[in-house]
Amino acid sequence: MAKVEVGLDRVFLGGAHSSIQGKRIGLLTNHTAVDRNGVTAIDRFLARKDCKLVALFAPEHGLYGQQHASEKIKDSKKGEVPIHSLYGANRRPTDAQLKGIDVVVIDIQDIGVRSYTYASSLFYMMEEAVKRNIEVVVLDRPNPINGLTVDGPMLHPKWRSFIGYINVPYIHGMTLGELAEFFNTEYKVSAKLTVIPMKGWKRGMDFKETGMQWIPTSPNIPESDTPLFYATTGLLGELRLCNIGVGYTLPFKLIGAPWMNAEQLSRYLNSQGLGGVRFTPLYFKPFSGSMAQLDCQGVLIQVVDKKTYKPFAVQGVLIGAIKSLYPQKFKEVMSHIGKSEKDLFCKAVGSEEPLQFLKEDKLVGWQIAEFQRAERELFMEKRKNYLRPEYAEDYRPNL
């Protein structure tokens, strides 16, 4: 098994720390930022004598990851170091919070999906740092989905928000460090940016191949493969069409409802010729959240080949299947979705066009799956400029 060294390892255990020596540090991080010995970035910085940790910045879910999605978080302290919440009264650091900081270091485990907000906190921080001539250092970590899968629509400027801040596909196949460099150049941010890359990570790696231990990034992302399923059913959750395993033991890994027929749905989905996935009938009872304590039927989504699996394409077929097999329930649920829910869906998906597809009478699955293919292909060409060469499968260092 590979032993990947993340950016944090290389800064403190590998000697690549000239960018922080003698500096006053602001650290955007949370509980996921640990080195190969399980020591957190916070503790590493607190223990250093050649730099000073003067402020902590916490993203959505809080510094310790215990807050649920959309819960506001107050400022607090860790010892004498202030913890500034970037998911409370404000989502951007203020003048007062950045005062006295020479370098902002960002170390956080992202999940590789545009609508997950950790990347947006990084982008906001970069924009605020450059206004104040503060350097930015990103300590890179793996994309847990992998660095090859690119799927889903781009982001239309109309729907730019905290759950989708830059124009990349819904599943972008980039690390947080690569996204930072993309944002810095393509959006002309021009921050003084340093990315400390990983050593030993390759784009095709499954997270379990890295030798790292997965730390849940938030309450409903408990396992290293959950991000792949978040990319598969998360938008279904925004539409509230059915239960997606949140409130049960398998968040994002299933779809189901009291009005579904498990055998019928699994047969239909398995007949669609989708690559890398199979659907198994499932009977379950959510213990909280959507459809709590109701007997539900649906399917367990089982990815059998991650290299051919396209999560957003599968999501389109799932929506199409529900509309095709249960048209009256589909119509009923969609009729009760208000403007705020529709807007949230459009912000997450990056466009209002998929919502228009859902209103059509015909089967919509493949329309959504193929949506914006040409735009995605153009992005793939641009993306090549920001992929770190050492992460390539065939990379050989110049010696």
Residue ranges with predicted function:
Residues 4-51:
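N-terminal phosphate-binding or glycine-rich loops at protein starts, especially the Walker A/P-loop
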Residues 52-60, 139:
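Short internal beta-strands
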Residues 65-69, 137-159:
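Glycine-rich, charge-decorated loop segments at or immediately adjacent to ligand/cofactor-binding or catalytic sites
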Residues 70-101, 113:
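Glycine-rich oxoanion-binding loops at beta->alpha junctions
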Residues 110-122:
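Glycine/threonine-rich flexible loop motifs
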Residues 160-232:
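Conserved anion/nucleotide-ligand pocket segment
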Residues 201-289:
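Glycine-rich, aromatic-lined ligand/substrate-binding cores of catalytic
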Residues 256-371:
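Conserved functional hotspot residues or short segments at active or partner-binding sites
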